[in-house]
Amino acid sequence: MSWFQKLMPRRIRTDAGPRSRSVPEGLWTKCESCQGILYRPDLERNLEVCPKCGAHMRISARQRLRLFLDESCEAVEIGAELQPSDFLRFRDSKRYRDRLNQAQKATGENDALVAMRGAVHQRPVVVCAFEFGFMGGSMGTIVGERFCRAAEEARANDIPLVCFSASGGARMQEALFSLMQMAKTSAAISRLNEARVPYISVLTDPTMGGVSASLATLGDVIIAEPGALIGFAGPRVIEQTVRETLPEGFQRAEFLLDHGAIDMIVDRRDMRDEIASLMGKLGGDVSVAPAPAPAATVDPEPESAEPEAPAEEAGPAGAAGDQAGESQDEGDPRNA
């Protein structure tokens, strides 16, 4: 025992003891754009948009659909029964089957696209959202099939289709079958165009590769979130290929808007209102709200006590009116 411990009263504790309070994990997070420390509940209330710099953070497909669709209207999932399979028995550094299992456990989804039918501001809509956490949101056979089923649901019911893209491109583990989804989804969008059903495409960070070269850039209206990376090959690959320095902000949403590649940039917090407004302009005022009550019946006007003058007594004015009616009938193309 040291001399200091001998001098201290016995009732005074010499150790700190167990910590009575601890900060829960995940209560604070860091913005990768401005490096600011953010309180997680405040960030969630701000729809995962940094309140300091406005950077839009990546969110899951389910979270995006939950923020976008009306809570009052029950959403019905489309193609949830479809399951991916390793039909090619593909293997690189790891078996494709193992990669699927790992991604399913990490995200809780069975593939990289979630499709639902719901409503936005009481307007019916079919919406798709990519899950970037599932193998980089890559497009395989299940993703292509779910998108096509969602497009067919929209076409059959004459309601708009909205797709939130967040993908690295086609899934290489499915080889040509994944590349075929580019043509398959493009054909589904073509059928929507023939039926004059609106298709709104929202590009989020990142939208690259085969997805950007097919369904993501075929919308009637193309929207992007601020700062989203959009393109086919990445900027680093392009610089190594052309051996030139790319312009500042190349392949970002603002750069694409300035060069006419997209129609508008919309903040995530305004996305619901903006898309609902576009749906009203493109698809008419269709609502799933309850039908209004029937209008009150109006009693017919009482018959006039004075009888109408016979046609013979109408005089020249009546004859002129008959001649005008005959000339209008002759000029009407429906009587040709």
UniProtKB/Swiss-Prot annotation:
Entry's cofactor comment: Binds 1 zinc ion per subunit.
Compositionally biased spans, kind Acidic residues: 300-311
Compartment list: Cytoplasm
EC number: 2.1.3.15
GO biological process terms on file: fatty acid biosynthetic process; malonyl-CoA biosynthetic process
Pathway it works in: Lipid metabolism; malonyl-CoA biosynthesis; malonyl-CoA from acetyl-CoA: step 1/1
Assigned keywords, A-Z: ATP-binding, Cytoplasm, Fatty acid biosynthesis, Fatty acid metabolism, Lipid biosynthesis, Lipid metabolism, Metal-binding, Nucleotide-binding, Transferase, Zinc, Zinc-finger
Pfam families cross-referenced by the UniProt entry: Carboxyl_trans (PF01039), Zn_ribbon_ACC (PF17848)
UniProt keyword annotation of 4Fe-4S present: no
Cellular component terms (Gene Ontology): acetate CoA-transferase complex
One annotated GO molecular function: acetyl-CoA carboxylase activity
UniProt entry tagged with the keyword Heme: no
Zinc finger (C4-type): 31-53
Family affiliation: Belongs to the AccD/PCCB family.
Assembly mode: Acetyl-CoA carboxylase is a heterohexamer composed of biotin carboxyl carrier protein (AccB), biotin carboxylase (AccC) and two subunits each of ACCase subunit alpha (AccA) and ACCase subunit beta (AccD).
Protein name as catalogued: Acetyl-coenzyme A carboxylase carboxyl transferase subunit beta
